[in-house]
Amino acid sequence: MKRTPTKVAKAQALTDGAALNTGLVVGSHGRHCVVETADGQRVICHPRGKKSQSVVGDRVRWQAATDEGTIEQVETRRNLFYRQDEIRTKSFAANLDQVLILIAAEPEFSETQLTRALIAAEAEQIRPIIALNKSDLGALFEASWQRLAPYRAMGYTVIPLSLKQAQQQLDHPDTNHPVSSLAQEGQAQLLALLSGQTTLVLGPSGSGKSTLINALVPGAQVVTGEISQALNSGKHTTTTTTWYWVDRIASATAQRTALIDSPGFQEFGLHHIAPAQLAQLMPDIKAHAQECRFYNCTHLHEPGCGVLAQVESESTPGAISARRHRIYQQLFEELGQQRW
């Protein structure tokens, strides 16, 4: 029987308060979170101390109290995803199988923001997927698709989508809404990649992220609203990182399909990464970093730099684009700045 998560329940109704319970963190705001139990009930919890602070996707051990639970232990994580503003690095999702970076042909996406997200995924050895929405826009989409050519050459999975057409099909299944073969192929590929996986969905405003989640998770707005209300985060539900079960996508394994929706794509930072690590997290730079004369080459100005040699011969197949190297330079300088 399909398990349907219930509304947030009082902790004391779930246990006698003596033994530790296990659960999954499905919502987080500030120091409080919502933990889902094995039978689908949801409990408001807070951490016992800094070592028990949790993020969405964490498996935790918690103890019931009078009105809410206390997280006593966070189980060992497979990985941890970070975001950052100008001052602070903050973890916000754990135990991911992959990251879906959703961008669009219109408004024009930021290649720097895309690169930041890819680097963050590479740093935690999380598989990234790039999806370019609005394939129905013709020439605008084609231009954006060409901008992503270097990323396809690096081996990243890049999928074309038309979420507008997909949504029309879902809303009006009895009406003929033509969907291009390109969009159909991309949609089928995306559903196959999501099946049985835990996927963090990232994307700037206008990319279609809400459309995607609402299409895959009927009632997603209701779930988000309940979690936000329980966590006292008010009406601004976009500030809350939320876990969704996606029962619409069948899984060939015992693992259910899940999406994690989180805001703040514009705030993506990398200050938890040292400048010297950067080249190893950008596949096109990494491919030529071993060709440098000096072992500690920064790939910015040194003589005999294998990376710079490839930038200078940009017309050569497999070479590094000048645009990508500018992004590397900007990030290297940013990560080298002193942080207080």
Where are the model-predicted features located?
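N-terminal accessory targeting/assembly segments
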Residues: 1-111
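Helix-rich effector regions associated with P-loop NTPase G domains
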Residues: 16-19, 56-59, 64-68, 75-99, ...
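Short, glycine/charged-enriched secondary-structure capping and boundary segments
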Residues: 39-41, 88, 114-117, 144-147, ...
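Canonical P-loop GTPase G-domain recognition
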Residues: 137-207
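Walker A/P-loop
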Residues: 205, 210-211, 215
